[in-house]
Amino acid sequence: MCIRDRNEKFMSFVEGVAKTILATNPADVEALKEEKFDGTDRTVTETLNDLVLSIGENMKVRRFERMDGIVSTYIHGGGSVGVMVGFDVADESKAATAEFDAMGKNVAMQIAAMSPAYLDEASVPAEVVEHEKTILAAQMKEDPKMASKPEAVLAKIAAGKMGKYYKENCLVDQEFVRSDLFQGDVKGYVASVAKELGTEIKLNGFIRMMKGDGLEKREENFAEEIAKQING
């Protein structure tokens, strides 16, 4: 069997698994394995075993994520990174427009390229905030330039540094990578499109999955790859 045939069989299986997840909404991977594979009377596990025997490659379903509602997606590099991003739209009819579709894809590409850890400041766990503040306090204590500064000034500096942390790690606060379309942060970009469409749009969550997550893998610069893709 040639590589092309193996790839086509694998992609057909992946598509079938995705359709099965959409149709049955399994609670987890173990539940998914026992569901009937899309369009057949065989389970996902049985179908996977057939595929393994057919193409001679050992495989297993490790994870999946599902989002409901208004969702935009982006797949990078033939499946190396996949993104889903959810929106609340006051006038849901606007979600069917070309402008919304482009905005959703651009935000999903942002997530693929910049890998934000959180949606917004409120999404950052309290323990993470405290950990970052502890690190900042230790750094400032070791900095001779900070020794003579009043507490109020130190507090302001610390707040500024935390703001930088949020800007780097929270999607809505990140600088929008498509500066050719909008200069500002992601929430500003979304707000600008919402204004153009005459409705309210709010980001409500995202999922970013990278091929090989949890496995040993080589480092890749997705921000650079996506920038090249944007610039042609």
Cite the ranges covered by each PLM segment.
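N-terminal assembly/interaction segments in proteins that build large macromolecular machines
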Residues: 4-232
